[in-house]
Each structure stands twice: as C-alpha cells, then as structure tokens.
Curated annotation (Swiss-Prot):
GO terms for molecular function: [acyl-carrier-protein] phosphodiesterase activity. PANTHER family: ACYL CARRIER PROTEIN PHOSPHODIESTERASE. This is Acyl carrier protein phosphodiesterase. The lineage of its organism: Bacteria, Pseudomonadati, Pseudomonadota, Gammaproteobacteria, Enterobacterales. The keyword Lipid biosynthesis applies. It comes from Klebsiella pneumoniae (strain 342). GO terms for biological process: fatty acid biosynthetic process.
C-alpha cells in the first residue's frame, strides 16, 4: 500500500492518519518519540505492509513482472494499488468524495509536521500542493512517481522499467485489487488491522 491506501484504511479504522502516513519515515521503535495515537498509527501501517506483502493476490501479481523488474515489484505494486483506489474511490467510499477526504487528511497531518522527521516534512511540501493523492488516478502521474523514486535512489532504477509491467498487466492487476482491497477495508472497519 502507498500513501492513499494507508490513509484510507487508517480513516476506516479510526486510527491516526499522521501516524499511518509517517510510518515509512520512522525507523525502529517509535516509543517515547511520539504521542500514543501516532505510535499506534505507525504500528498499524507496519502491520498493513506485512499483511499486504503476504496476500496471495499480491504475491501472484509480483510474478507477472519481468525478471529485470521483479525486485522492485513490491514498490511498484504499492503505487499501483493507490492508482486503483483513486480510480474507484467513488465506488469504494461513496459517502466521502476523494477531494474532501484529501482535505480532511491534510488538516489532520499538517499540524504535526513541526514534530515530524525532516524527510516526512519534505514529502508533505509536495503531497498536498501538487495533489498527489488525487493525481494517482492518472497513469502518467504513476509513471512520474516511479521515475522520481528511481531518480532519488539509483539502486531502484528498475522502477523506470516496471511501468511496462503495469501497462502489460493493467487489467489483471485491477482484478487483483478488487479481490483483496475490499477485504482490507472490512478489516479496518472492524479494527482488525
């Protein structure tokens, strides 16, 4: 899962949106560094990552990547799940339009930025102003995201080429998303994540 899915599941679970979004920027044990609700959100994010990586649908989707891009498939898929969530937001969350949810999330997260890791603060400078969460609907933006990650981390250069795998298997990936994401939503609503 990437930013949008983590925020969505956190919202459904009444968990900390800042903690869930910040988790990838916090290493090790966060105890003592953040308020309890942020820590709970960090741990929820980590549980979701482990659960998602071990889902049969996600493991199968990884196998659809070519050998030269399979190593980065987990990262590429995380971004792609956000694409499908953004694409189908109105169906999955009919009572809360995506633009309203994004405004709500921003209002929850921006106030905690002064006490946040610098890399997380940097992310937030772009996430909201460039409307990333809404733009995940656009496959051109997904390609830009993958290229940006590859540019910042040379060992992830294969992310550039993983775009081709997404294009080749788009319909199958969308099917996989529908097989697992509604279940994740139910788990979140039942506080089981």
């Amino acid at each position: 899962m990437n930013f949008l899915a983590h925020l969505h599941l956190a919202h459904l679970a009444d968990s900390s949106l800042p903690g869930n979004l910040m988790a990838d920027f916090v290493r090790g044990n966060p105890q003592g560094d953040y308020p309890a609700e942020i820590i709970d959100g960090i741990y929820m994010h980590r549980r979701i990552d482990v659960m998602t990586d071990n889902l049969a649908e996600v493991k199968e989707a990884r196998e659809w990547f070519r050998p030269q891009t399979r190593r980065v498939a987990p990262i590429t898929l995380d971004v792609m799940w956000d694409h499908f969530l953004s694409q189908h937001w109105a169906q999955l969350s009919p009572d809360l339009p995506l633009d309203e949810f994004v405004r709500y999330a921003e209002q929850q997260i921006v106030p905690i930025l002064p006490d946040s890791p610098p890399r997380f603060v940097n992310l937030n400078q772009y996430l909201w102003s460039e409307r990333w969460l809404e733009r995940y609907q656009e496959m051109d933006f997904i390609q830009r995201v993958l290229n940006g990650m590859a540019s910042r981390r040379p060992r992830l250069d294969a992310l550039r080429d993983s775009w081709q795998d997404l294009d080749t298997h788009y319909d199958q990936l969308e099917g996989q998303f529908w097989r697992f994401y509604p279940q994740m939503m139910r788990l979140a609503e039942n506080k089981q994540l």
